[in-house]
Amino acid sequence: MTTQLEQAWELAKQRFAAVGVDVEEALRQLDRLPVSMHCWQGDDVAGFENTGAALTGGIQATGNYPGKARNATELRADLELALSLIPGPKRLNLHAIYHEAPEPVGRNEIKPEHFKNWVEWAKANKLGLDFNPSCFSHPLSADGFTLSHADDEIRQFWIDHVKASRRVSAYFGEQLGTPSVMNIWIPDGMKDITVDRLAPRQRLLAALDEIISEKINPAHHIDAVESKLFGIGAESYTVGSNEFYMGYATSRQTALCLDAGHFHPTEVISDKISAAMLYVPRLLLHVSRPVRWDSDHVVLLDDETQAIASEIIRHDLFDRVHIGLDFFDASINRIAAWVIGTRNMKKALLRALLEPTAALKQLEENGDYTARLALLEEQKSLPWQAIWEMYCQRNDAPAGSQWLDNVRAYEKEVLSQRG
C-alpha cells in the first residue's frame, strides 16, 4: 500500500516538474555536498588535553546542560547517534586539541599517530575528516597573540604547531581518500587602542608563508585562512582581519574561510561568496548564527542560511566550496544541537536545488523583475518538505521530528549517567 509519505512525494514531484525542476536530479546533486560537522559542539570546545585550561581566544560556550562528552569514546558515541539522524553525506571537523596521545604532548609536537583512532573511526563510518590547529586555551596564547607574537620563541612555537597540524591534515586526506580542509584561525588582537597595527600583520604574513612553504599534495590537504572582526578581549584590533586574509588567500591562492559570525552584524557572508570566488580557488564556509555578536548559536533554516545555500547552487560551486558548521551551544542537548543545525543546512541546500534557477535567471536577464520577485516568493511554498522526507527515508534517517525521540532515549540511558 502506498504510504502517506510516498503519496506526498509523488504529488510534490509533479508540482516541481510543472516549474521545470527534476527532483531526482536535485537529490543526486544534494549528495555531492557533504556538510562537515564540528566535533567541538559535543564538549564545549574542551578537547582532550585535560590541562584544566579555560576556553580562551575571545570565544565562549554558554550554558551548562548535563551530559557533555568527557573523553574521545563518549564524544564518538555521541557523534554516531547524531550522524545516524542526519541524511546524506557528512564529514567531521576536528581541532588539534582532540588528539589522543598516550602521554602529554606539546601542541608543536602533535603527530598523525595521535589521531589514528579518529581515522579508523572515520573509515568505519564512511566519513571524511577536516582539521584545525588550536591556537587558543594555552599558556602561550594567554596574552592574546600566537602567530603574530612579538616574542620569536613563542611565535615559532605556534608556527611549529600549525606545521604539525598540516601534516596531520595530510594524513587524514591520504588515509581517507578525500582532501582534508585545514582552517587556520588565530585569536590575535588587542582589547584597546592599538598604536602599531602593521608590525603584527607583518609577522603574521611571514609566519603563514613559513607554514605553507612545505609542499603538500592538494589531493590530501587544503589550506584555508579565516578572518574575524573582533573577539572578547580583542575588541579594538584583530591582526587577521578580512582585508588581511582576503589579500593573503588571493596572493597565495589558498582557500578563504568565511564565517557567518565573523563580520559586522549588518554584513552577511552570502553576499561575499560570489565576490571572493573571483579571486580565490576555493572557499570554506563556517555556517553559524551570530546573535548580536559571534555568539555561535545553532544554525536555523533562516534567510541567511538559505541565501548561503542558494549562492552555492546558483553558481554551480559544488567543487569549489566546502561547507562546515561552527556553533557551540551548551544550554541545550548537544546532540540535538548537531542534528538541528546540520539538518537545517542540508534542508537549505535541498531547497536551493529545487529552485527553478534557469527560469529565474532568464527573467532577470530580460529585466522582468516583477515576475522574478513573484516566482521567487511562490516557489517558497512549493512542497519541498515532501522531497526532504523522502530523502530522509532513502538514507535511513527520521523524516520529521521523530529524531528527537532517539535523542531523548539516549539522554535518559547514557547522558544522564555522566554526572
Curated annotation (Swiss-Prot):
One of its GO terms (molecular function) is manganese ion binding. Keywords: Cytoplasm, Isomerase, Manganese, Metal-binding, Rhamnose metabolism. It comes from the Bacteria. Disulfide bonds: none annotated. GO terms for biological process: L-lyxose metabolic process; rhamnose catabolic process. It is found in: Cytoplasm. Belongs to the rhamnose isomerase family. HAMAP family: RhaA. Catalyzes the interconversion of L-rhamnose and L-rhamnulose. This is L-rhamnose isomerase.
